[in-house]
Amino acid sequence: MTDKPGIVITGASGRMGQMLIKTVLDSDKAELAGVVEREGHDWVGQDIGIAMGGAALGVVVTDDAGSAFAGAQAVIDFTAPQATIAFSKLAAEAGCVHVIGTTGMSEAEIAQLDPAAQDTVLVRAGNMSLGVNLLVQLTKKVAAALDEDFDIEVIEAHHHHKVDAPSGTALMLGEAAAEGRGVALAEVSDRGRDGITGARKKGDIGFSAIRGGDIVGEHDVLFAAAGERIVLRHMATDRAIFARGALKAALWGQGKDAGAYDMIDVLGL
């Protein structure tokens, strides 16, 4: 037995799933308690080490999330919205900290996480890296300092496998800019321009998405006025930064009161 928190990774076969597994295995502060994949996946029933092309680790991939969560201390979840909602209920029942990096969730889907946060620690963020969360804070401060003579645009780039746009990080940055200006993002968001769109509406916050190659993640927040521009930028070159941040959140959540938290809370920013 060990006093290290046991971590379950969902979506084990995905890019982030495998990176999370490696991060937990490399950590001296946590242990891998379980791995989950969807029903019917080729990995189900295999030892995760062998499934990932290495030596056996004694942890078998399961499609029974409830059983995997039982006895674990945290779940790290980078999957899909409906899966995350289901996992949130199971994590709450098991008393596991639930760290959510799933993106592409609608406001209605996010609201479905609220009941779980009444019973356990739920940490959700569109991006788990320290650098991006610092960028969020900077964006809020710059937006608050500048008036609407500065147009705000959020430009993001990701690999060609990414299925949602704008990215969760781009939306975090847009929310920060809107908060800095004291407005609701939903009222000023401009997510698509094509054809004869007319002049840019003053006060809008625009979004542009690029998809190509193996780009891990790049985000620019542009403040553009007549005669000058300010650009705040973050470039991720290794998705390990997201895995390290997620593990940090899982460890931070141990012993905390039930509730909904984000990486700003985890990092104390």
From Swiss-Prot:
Coiled coil: none annotated. It is an enzyme of class 1 (oxidoreductase). NADP(+) binds at R38. CDD domains: DHDPR_N. One of its GO terms (cellular component) is cytosol. Its main location: cytoplasm. Its EC number is 1.17.1.8. The active site is at H158, K162. It is found in: Cytoplasm. Keywords: Amino-acid biosynthesis, Cytoplasm, Diaminopimelate biosynthesis, Lysine biosynthesis, NAD, NADP, Oxidoreductase. Pathway: Amino-acid biosynthesis; L-lysine biosynthesis via DAP pathway; (S)-tetrahydrodipicolinate from L-aspartate: step 4/4. The gene is dapB. Catalyzes the conversion of 4-hydroxy-tetrahydrodipicolinate (HTPA) to tetrahydrodipicolinate. InterPro entries: DapB_C, DapB_N, DapB_N_CS, DHDPR_bac, NAD(P)-bd_dom_sf. Pfam families: DapB_C, DapB_N. (S)-2,3,4,5-tetrahydrodipicolinate binds at H159, G168, T169. NAD(+) binds at G11, A12, S13, G14, R15, M16, E37, G101, T102, T103, A125, G126, N127, M128. GO terms for molecular function: 4-hydroxy-tetrahydrodipicolinate reductase; NAD binding; NADP binding; oxidoreductase activity, acting on CH or CH2 groups, NAD or NADP as acceptor. GO terms for biological process: diaminopimelate biosynthetic process; lysine biosynthetic process via diaminopimelate. This is 4-hydroxy-tetrahydrodipicolinate reductase. It catalyses: (S)-2,3,4,5-tetrahydrodipicolinate + NAD(+) + H2O = (2S,4S)-4-hydroxy-2,3,4,5-tetrahydrodipicolinate + NADH + H(+); (S)-2,3,4,5-tetrahydrodipicolinate + NADP(+) + H2O = (2S,4S)-4-hydroxy-2,3,4,5-tetrahydrodipicolinate + NADPH + H(+).
